[in-house]
Each structure stands twice: as C-alpha cells, then as structure tokens.
C-alpha cells in the first residue's frame, strides 16, 4: 500500500526540536557543562537535517513565485519547445562513439580542431603556407574573459581546447544514445556546437549541463545558454527540469537574447 508523505512544516520543525530537547534533558545530566554542549550539538544536527530537507523545496518555490524561472524572448521561446526528461542515463556512454575529429564533412581535408581554431582565434598563423594546421594565434576566451596566446606544441596546445557547448555525455543522456553512428558523428564534429575555450574552464565544466556549470564571464552566459538551446533544438535533445530552470534564470536577465545563427 502506498503512503502519502508531506514535507515538514516550520511548526513541525519547532515541535520536533522541542521534543528532542526534552528527551536529551531527561537522558543526560544537564548540570554538567560538557553535556550541555552535547545537547546543543544534538539539537543543531537535528535542525540542520530538517532544514536540509525543507530548503530545496522552499528555494524552488521562491524561484517560481519571484519569476526567476520565467523568461521571454526568442531563445526562451525555443527553450519552451524542448522536451523535458528527468529520467536520463549515462549508461553505455563512450566519447569515441561520437567520432570527434574523425570526419571531414566539408571535404577540405582539414581537421575540425584546426578549423575551430582558425575561426575563433585572431592573428592566426599556420605551420605551412596554405595549410590547415594552426601554429599560433590569440584567443579572447568567451568563458573566462581572458586573453590567451596559443602556440602549438606538446606542452602548450592544451592552453586552448575545443569545447562541445552541449557536452557529448550530456547529449548522450539527452537522446543521442538512440542515434545511429552517422548522426552521432555529425553531432561530434558540428562546428555549431564547437568553441575554442580556455583549457582549464573546459576541464572544469566537464559534461555538466547549465544546471551545474556556467561561464565565469557573466557577459557571455546568455549567449552560452542560447547556444545550448539552439544545439538541443537542432538535434531534438531534451533538457532536465533543473537544466531548464537554470536556463530560464539566465534568460530572465536578457529577454532580447536570440538563438545564435549557424
């Protein structure tokens, strides 16, 4: 038989705390200073546990009431069309299933990493005249706001990494696990979902969605979230409830934000 559970109210918390204090007073000799401290610690732990249970719910409700999770504008409109799926699984994920850097969709013989570097860096030089391989350049990093001098080499190339705006593992969880190889390879090498970025920021993000990671450069957050929405719309990928709320909270600050063009 199923049972309905409700979250404890503040009155419940207060009553529970009082009852706990009475029990501890009976159990221990409160004339002892050490045991007084112990009583306070026990009560603090109990209250802390109950607050931990209640606060997430309160925070979510406050967000709804204050309009934090309400946004309007072109990007927000597209977000509202995305499927919401909280039953996501990373089982079976393997980065190699997306064939990153294994295709040449435009047939120019250039590696997609070098194509992104050539697009996103300034003052670009190549290892050979007329070639594809980027030797050096300057990145004005959108994630951090830093300016990074890129120089190709075993010890220096990692300063600038190629970032999947919608991470491959997040895509897998959001629907890519059901794709065929051709579609996964297309996604893994789609320039629309690729960005040259600070290596440390890319590593810090990992496979996190907008619910758990946003660029430290606040000026880029609206465009970043809009890009993720654009990618997910293009490939019919879902979002989780938390992810959607995080996106709406960002877009709430920029109602004119559009989906970036390809």
Model-derived features: positions:
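N-terminal Lys/Arg-rich, disordered targeting/topogenic segments
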Residues: 1-34
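A charge-rich, low-complexity, intrinsically flexible signal that marks solvent-exposed coils, linkers
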Residues: 2, 30, 34-38, 87, ...
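Hydrophobic membrane-insertion alpha-helices, especially the h-region
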Residues: 36-56
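Ser/Thr/Pro/Gly-rich low-complexity linker/stalk segments immediately outside membranes or between
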Residues: 56-78
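An N-terminal structural lobe/cap that precedes and organizes the functional/catalytic core
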Residues: 85-94, 99, 111-116, 147-154, ...
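N-terminal post-signal-peptidase region of extra-cytosolic proteins
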Residues: 98-103, 112-136, 179-183
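Acidic, glycine-anchored loop motifs typical of Ca2+
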Residues: 107-109
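Domain-level detector of nuclease and nuclease-like folds
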Residues: 134, 143-262
């Amino acid at each position: 038989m199923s049972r309905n559970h409700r979250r404890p109210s503040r009155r419940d918390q207060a009553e529970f705390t009082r009852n706990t204090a009475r029990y501890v007073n009976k159990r221990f000799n409160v004339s002892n200073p050490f045991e007084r401290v112990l009583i306070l610690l026990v009560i603090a732990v109990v209250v802390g546990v109950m607050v931990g249970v209640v606060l997430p719910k309160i925070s979510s409700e406050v967000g709804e009431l204050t309009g934090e999770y309400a946004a309007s504008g072109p990007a927000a409109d597209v977000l509202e069309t995305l499927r919401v799926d909280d039953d996501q699984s990373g089982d079976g994920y393997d980065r190699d299933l997306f064939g990153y850097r294994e295709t040449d969709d435009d047939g120019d013989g250039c590696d997609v990493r070098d194509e992104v570097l050539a697009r996103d860096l300034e003052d670009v030089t190549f290892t050979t005249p007329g070639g594809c391989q980027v030797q050096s350049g300057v990145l004005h990093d959108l994630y951090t706001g830093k300016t990074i001098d890129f120089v190709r080499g075993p010890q220096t190339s990692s300063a600038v990494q190629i970032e999947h705006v919608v991470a491959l593992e997040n895509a897998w969880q959001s629907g890519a696990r059901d794709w065929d190889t051709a579609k996964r390879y297309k996604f893994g090498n789609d320039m629309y979902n690729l960005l040259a970025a600070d290596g440390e920021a890319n590593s810090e993000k990992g496979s996190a969605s907008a619910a758990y990671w946003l660029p430290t450069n606040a000026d880029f957050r609206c465009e970043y979230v809009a890009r993720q929405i654009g990618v997910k719309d293009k490939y019919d990928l879902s979002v989780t409830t938390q992810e959607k709320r995080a996106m709406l909270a960002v877009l709430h600050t920029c109602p004119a934000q559009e989906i970036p063009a390809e």
